[in-house]
Each structure stands twice: as structure tokens, then as C-alpha cells.
Regions:
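Short loop/turn segments at secondary-structure transitions that flank enzyme active sites
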Residues: 20-22, 67-69, 101, 128, ...
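Surface-exposed helix-capping loop/turn segments at secondary-structure junctions
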Residues: 1-3, 124-130, 215
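Solvent-exposed, flexible loop/coil residues
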Residues: 33, 82-85, 147, 193-194, ...
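Structural recognition of the beta-strand scaffold that forms the well-ordered cores
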Residues: 13-16, 58-63, 91-97, 113, ...
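The catalytic-center signature of Zn2+-dependent metalloproteases
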Residues: 100-199
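Residues that flank catalytic or metal-binding motifs in active/ligand-binding sites
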Residues: 10, 55-57, 89-91, 109, ...
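Active-site-proximal segments of metallohydrolase catalytic domains
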Residues: 2-94
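Pan-zinc metallopeptidase signature
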Residues: 193-215
Length: 215
């Protein structure tokens, strides 16, 4: 693959919490029956108001039965960026139950939807953010080793090259490795081609760690 040298080990490990905010032992999973907490587009934070733990100590993930898209679309999950001017109590991921795990009613996504949404929590944009944009450090997903991408490619893993400005831009701290036009990076977790997602890049890793230091 043209991107085989652009695969980053994020060096982030997730564990279920062993103590709750009150210091009591926990398995890290709580179950709450809240049929009135409808997560409609106009009230995305409804499930979060039912229960949330200190976001400075825990990454909250609310697993729900369904998510209303309100537009006829198919919303699998959504997340809050660390820079979003909302209450810290709403920081985290809301995700459909059938997008978690690999048994029972689970979809064929193998957990990639949750990986994608946690990426947003850690300040990563979609690879098709801003379409083709201009220069990589000022437009698009603001990461120069993810080539610009015009749209979500209809969630397809098929070969595509939707932008021709891949070589534009780059800085010492956000280097652009491309010296010629390259295919769209459908393998990236921050795209929509769930069937072939397999990587984050060094530039995305640097952006995540910058967010850790900033927020």
C-alpha cells in the first residue's frame, strides 16, 4: 500500500474503570433504563444527562438502543470534540448498541465505529473535512499526511482519487510526505469506509497528543 509507511501506533490503552467516582468498586459498566431519554437531533445530550462520570477521570461512552438522525440518514454514533464549547459533563461518545462488540446483534463493523468516534473525542476530523481544501495545514482535517478527500466516497473501499492537491502545504511540525498525487486514504479510521478502516497516521497521532496537552 502507498500508505504502509504512514501507519502510527497511537500508544493509547483503554481499560474499564475499576472504581466509580465515589471510590466504590465497579466493572466499569453501568446499565440504566431511561426510555424518556430520547436522543433526537434537537436533544443529543439527553442520554448524557441520565448518568455521567467526571470526564477528567473517565472517558464516558453511552451505549444506546437507537439514535434518531432526523433526516432519514443512518447515525451510528456521535461524539463531542474537546474544543466544543459545551459542558464537560457531555464530553464523550454516544453509540448504538449494535455497533459495539462482535457477537450477538453486533454489526460487521468490528468496533471501528467506536474507534472513529473516539477519534473525534481526541480532536480528529473526518478525512473528507472541507473537501479538497487548499493547503493541508490550513484546511481539510488539518493533518498533512492524510491526503485531501472530496467526500465520504459513499462509504466505499473502492479505489478513488478525488483531489489533486495532495502535495500542497506542510510544515516542520505537520509534514506532508507526498511528492505526487496519491489515492484517497480509505483505510483511515476517520473516513466512512468502515469495511477497510485499519490505520491512523503519525500526523493524526501528533494532533491527538497536542489535544491531550491542550485540554
Amino acid at each position: 500500500s502507498v500508505f504502509s509507511n504512514l501507519i502510527a501506533d497511537m500508544e493509547i490503552e483503554f481499560r474499564l474503570a475499576q472504581k466509580d467516582p465515589n471510590g466504590n468498586c465497579t466493572q466499569g459498566i453501568t446499565r440504566t433504563n431511561a426510555p424518556s431519554a430520547s436522543n433526537s437531533p434537537s436533544n443529543r445530550n439527553a442520554p448524557k444527562s441520565v448518568i455521567n462520570w467526571d470526564p477528567y477521570s473517565y472517558l464516558n461512552i453511552w451505549v444506546v438502543n437507537s439514535i434518531s438522525s432526523g433526516s432519514g440518514g443512518n447515525t451510528l454514533g456521535f461524539a463531542q470534540f474537546p474544543s466544543t464549547p459545551q459542558s464537560a459533563s457531555t464530553y464523550g461518545v454516544v453509540i448504538r448498541a449494535d455497533e459495539v462488540g462482535m457477537i450477538g446483534s453486533a454489526s460487521s463493523a468490528d468496533g471501528r465505529t467506536l474507534t472513529h468516534e473516539v477519534g473525534h473525542c481526541f480532536n480528529l476530523y473526518h478525512t473528507f473535512q472541507g473537501q479538497c481544501g487548499t493547503t493541508c495545514q490550513f484546511s481539510g482535517d488539518l493533518v498533512c499526511d492524510t491526503p485531501p478527500q472530496f467526500d465520504d466516497l459513499n462509504n466505499s473501499c473502492n479505489f478513488s482519487n478525488s483531489c489533486s492537491n495532495d502535495i500542497n502545504g506542510g510544515t516542520t511540525s505537520n509534514p506532508n510526505p507526498f511528492t505526487s498525487d496519491v489515492p484517497d486514504q480509505t483505510e483511515n479510521y476517520m473516513g466512512y469506509a468502515i469495511g477497510c478502516q485499519a490505520l491512523f497516521t503519525p500526523g493524526q497521532k501528533a494532533r491527538v497528543y497536542a489535544a491531550f496537552n491542550s485540554y
